[in-house]
Amino acid sequence: MSDALAGLRVVEIGEQIAAPYCTKLLVDLGAEVVKVERPAGDPLRSWGPGGGLFEYLNAGKHGLTVDLGMSSGLAQVHEMIAQADVLVEDLPAGSADRFEWGLDREALERINPGLVVVRISDYGQEGPRRAQPSTPLTLQAAAGWVNTREFGRAPVQAGARIPEYIVGGYAALAALTALRISTVEQDRVVEADVSAFEALLSTLPYPMLLAERLKSMGLPPNSKAAPMLGIVRAADGWIGINCLTGQHWLDVCAMMGLPEFGEHQLAIMLGGPERDEFFAKAQPWLDSMPVADLVELSQAMRIPAAPINDGSSILDCPQYRDRDFFVDAGPEGARFQRPGAPFRLSKTPAGAPRPAPLLGGADTVQWSTGRERDASEADAATPFAGLKVFDLSTFWAGAYLTCYLGAFGADVVKVESIQRPDGHRYSGSLLRSSDDWYEVGPLWQGTNLNKRDVTLDLSSDAGLELARRLAADADVVIENFSPRVVEQFGLDYDSLVKINPGVIMVRMPGFGLEGPWRDYVGWALNIEQLSGMSAVTGYADGPPCNLQGPADPIAGVHATVALLAALEHRRRTGEGQLIEVAQIEVGAAVTAEPVIEYSLTQRVREREGNRHRHYAQGVYAAAGEDDWVALSVRDDADWAAVTEVVGRPDLRDDPKFVSADARLAHHGEFDEVIAEYAATRSAEEFAEALLGRGVPAQRLMTGDRMYDVDQLDARGFYEDLDHRIAGRQRFPGWPFRITPGPSRHHRSPSPTLGQHNDEVLGALGLTPDEISTLRERRVIGERLLNA
């Protein structure tokens, strides 16, 4: 049994989380990675207790410690690169080191033509912001990730450095996509330019599209409404109860004995007096219910609910425990538990974790057998051309995967029915303004570009038989329902492999295909809640907070990475396989630090709000209404610049602020100084003044301003597409540019319901009369029933 990426050779010149997580995913899939470190080592070695996070991100890699300032050190690195397939680096955009170290494109083409190079930076290698100073907080602020999560509190960032893992996931996706292009461009370096800023934008639920829609209807463009109930306190802890449809809300009201609030969902979501009245009556009932009982009751009613797991409780969660997801790692005397691989491949499973490299690693590293590089007839602009994808996805996670494949050339056929269309069509259903409302929802459109659409009633014999015929001809089948859904139709892997032995099937259940909770309802919010993402987000003295949805595209990215590895395995061996991506395991994989830290210290770290462990920073109200600025003071030079901007040079050498440690010790007083000045200026003015002096700062981004960003314009992040009903709209692209590679992000707008029925079914050999009969029997159709 070989690994999916057996023979793939990767050199990593990266630190902290994003680049190491990118290559960690490749290691999980069987690639061989050499991590290059300078003598001082990756700073992550000293982050947190026992270096556990470094061990997690760098397990199984070879180590090469060199002084890149010396010619002998560079020669060693160049020797490794000359034999590699992929180089992953995270040097700042425009860094002089890239040229001095011979890592620029021209130098690399002399060393290794045909190399894939993944360059990770904050804003990308080009554009007016490419050299702008930033920190994880200010990047989150710029991308709309710092927002109001708790009524009455300042907007707050996502915790536990989750966004950095997201960037690493996209970098792995870029690497494997560029690898397919390199089979066409064998004598050229293929570069993937990954923007962390764009990666964070790419995981948002299309707020720029929603803002345009709300404005067109005369409504405020930046809605702060969040699904009810959200995260609430029960008898013995926090629980997430998530009403993502109108039926969920009615069921929750009935469950709590409060049916009179069934007609007031929107008013309660928006925080009016109805909200206070509702919770005054709901909280006593919640206080009487243990979390476990409330989760079980809610799930029995098909209401998405989950406990709020932290680094301790997640280890005792029945679903994770039954699936043996957390594994032992670390050296003797410092053992800890960490997440396992975030995907399971039936024919090429990930092995047990191996140790991370020690600093001062071997002078030479011997690669194992290299990868065979067969020439491809594909076009570099469409690296997935010829790939047939049968898309049984619903909502966001699976649809995000198939949208990506279709963008770069795959023929994706999405299956819905006029009786039960993709539930994403109902997202934003409160905005119904025409008979075709189900065709124009921002979330539906954004996740279903680049596809063809057929409708098949799978409850009918004729519809199910046609689905099986489509699956029999597919290279890849994708689904992300609860496990029992495709199994009851006989469309699971064991059934499909009998009619299509080489098929690769990707299953993306919320909770996994096995375990006591496998049939629980899994939506993004309760995935975030169960996996620890919510527990680390928010203020120390407040409740855990939802991230509002990124778990879906994060799972989609990880599933795509696993699929591309499986396609590489099939290229070499002809063998298909089943890929299982349990979304709760992806969530835990990108929230690794809390469980690692707890298992090393037996302590659960408090939520950190907007603070950082090593320097002072925060989010502050500016003079405008609901206008906020985020800033970080990384060092004494930043602090000196801040004192000049706020007109308090006397504070530069104040003992309370004279060093990073002093500023952390007096963070409350630091906040007061910044807040007092921020309240007198617009957020944009304050941020620009700080940026002009080299201090990381950003005005908090909102949906209605996301189309007006010079950096995104310069990099062509948005793309206009004409929809037959919605007209021309601008859609976000993917957070990387591959050169040589695709010149466009998307190939076609989202399809209308059943738009390609005649085309797809005709290709199966059905006559026009047979197709007409199917339409008369409502096996297929082009209009939603009971709309």
Feature map (PLM): residue ranges:
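Conserved Rossmann-fold dehydrogenase catalytic segment
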Residues: 125, 153-162, 183-200, 218-224, ...
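Terminal low-complexity tails and localization/encapsulation signals of metabolic enzymes
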Residues: 1-9, 233, 311-391, 615, ...
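Substrate-binding/catalytic subdomain of NAD(P)-dependent oxidoreductase enzymes
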Residues: 178-219, 307, 311, 566-607, ...
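Short, well-structured beta-strand/strand-turn elements
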Residues: 33, 299-313, 412-415, 691-705, ...
